[in-house]
């Protein structure tokens, strides 16, 4: 099991939908989160993309020299940049990070944002662009010189001179809920990502992508994007969930849902359908809470509960085939520690910390009464 954390380049805070308790995005703050994730043994961090965020590639490049082993899942936007240019970017970051780049392919689900970036295409046409883009990108990254003429993209003599460290290219991650997205995942990507839907819905998506990948004679791994609200007791966790949305009023929720309504993302539609813009029935599956999605686009659900319960829910997703968990929590610095401390001991996490010598076996924790070495409880 690989567990990722999240760099909140669109802002952070203690509450949703308000400036109360908010934190600005600064280099020192992002550095704290990245270094905490590195020291705690997270596999990597997701760096989000979109006009609501700082640029993902610039942020990842700033964090790389400040970390030792942390991987960076960074978005590339087909149609916004050329596949050859994107290949150069990816190869350079992979080389300079000593092979710590992972590439998140984002087709985009906001027509207004896409048009602002110069992309005037309908939903399925954007997936055609992404398909052509990845066909070129993968070949260029593998060292080929590519001539290609497609429906939307054309290159002649496309190549890069500095190859990536990870051959044939850094792993490709991708999420999407439409049939077009599933077909593209089957043809091109290494890891298919889903937002945190109830297990039965996730199982259906996994089965469909697996079936399509088998028809392409490929295999695909699977991951899930979730928020987490974990505490030592269930009561404390649910109190924290309610506290997260304590400042939300009906007008803020309605404005957010109206904004989401103009998107043509099937994944966003499915997120909104879980809560229907109402705050009175947010537990949409055992311990799966849709409160985040009242005002946050994209991943809108959180696993809520005590550590044993949340770990059990994660293992249930793992039994469906999920290997990668991309988690987050508010505020992201404190919750990076809480999630690692409460969940990692209860999960089969592939964990290699950067800040602890492999020869350092203890003691861990403050010495008791100046004489007694503390031990972890067996409960």
UniProtKB/Swiss-Prot annotation:
EC class: oxidoreductase
Reactions this protein catalyses: an alkanesulfonate + FMNH2 + O2 = an aldehyde + FMN + sulfite + H2O + 2 H(+)
Keywords noted in UniProt: Flavoprotein, FMN, Monooxygenase, Oxidoreductase
Pfam families (UniProt xref): Bac_luciferase (PF00296)
Disulfide bond annotation, renumbered to this chain: none
Zinc as UniProt keyword: no
UniProt-recorded Gene Ontology molecular function terms: alkanesulfonate monooxygenase activity
Keyword Oxidoreductase carried by entry: yes
EC numbers for this chain: 1.14.14.5
Biological processes per GO annotation: alkanesulfonate catabolic process
InterPro entries listed in its UniProt record: Alkanesulphonate_mOase_FMN-dep, Luciferase-like_dom, Luciferase-like_sf, SsuD_RutA_monooxygenase
Source superkingdom: Bacteria
Homology family: Belongs to the SsuD family.
Function: Catalyzes the desulfonation of aliphatic sulfonates.
Protein name (record): Alkanesulfonate monooxygenase
The organism of origin for this protein: Sorangium cellulosum (strain So ce56) (Polyangium cellulosum (strain So ce56))
């Amino acid at each position: 099991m690989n567990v990722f954390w999240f760099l909140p380049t669109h802002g952070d805070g203690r509450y949703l939908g308000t400036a109360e308790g908010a934190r600005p995005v600064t280099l020192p703050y992002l550095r704290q989160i990245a270094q905490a994730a590195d020291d705690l043994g997270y596999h990597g961090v997701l760096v989000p993309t979109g006009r609501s965020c700082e640029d993902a590639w610039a942020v990842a490049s700033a964090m790389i020299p400040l970390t030792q082993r942390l991987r960076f899942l960074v978005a590339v936007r087909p149609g916004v940049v050329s596949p050859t240019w994107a290949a150069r970017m990816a190869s350079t970051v992979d080389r300079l990070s000593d092979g710590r780049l992972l590439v998140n392919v984002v087709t985009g689900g906001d027509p207004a944002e896409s048009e602002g970036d110069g992309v005037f295409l309908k939903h399925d046409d954007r997936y055609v662009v992404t398909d052509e883009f990845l066909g070129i990108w993968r070949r260029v990254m593998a060292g080929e010189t590519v001539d290609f003429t497609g429906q939307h993209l054309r290159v002649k003599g496309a190549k890069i001179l500095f190859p990536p460290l990870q051959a044939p290219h850094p792993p490709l991650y991708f999420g999407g809920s439409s049939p077009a997205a599933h077909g593209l995942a089957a043809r091109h990507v290494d890891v298919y990502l889903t937002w945190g839907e109830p297990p039965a819905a996730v199982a259906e998506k996994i089965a469909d992508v697996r079936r399509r990948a088998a028809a392409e004679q490929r295999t695909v791994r699977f991951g899930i994007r979730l928020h987490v609200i974990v505490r030592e007791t269930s009561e404390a966790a649910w109190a924290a969930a309610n506290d997260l949305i304590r400042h939300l009023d009906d007008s803020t929720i309605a404005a957010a849902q109206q904004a989401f309504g103009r998107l043509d993302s099937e994944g966003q539609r499915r997120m909104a359908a879980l809560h229907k813009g109402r705050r009175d029935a947010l537990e949409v599956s055992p311990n799966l809470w849709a409160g985040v999605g009242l005002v946050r686009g994209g991943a809108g659900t959180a696993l809520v509960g005590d550590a044993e319960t949340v770990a059990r829910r994660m293992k249930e997703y793992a039994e469906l085939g999920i290997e990668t968990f991309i988690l987050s929590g508010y505020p992201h610095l404190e919750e990076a520690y809480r999630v690692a401390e409460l969940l990692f001991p209860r999960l089969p996490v592939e964990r290699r910390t950067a800040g602890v010598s492999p020869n350092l076996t203890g003691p861990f924790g403050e010495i008791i009464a100046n004489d007694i070495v503390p031990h972890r409880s067996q409960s």
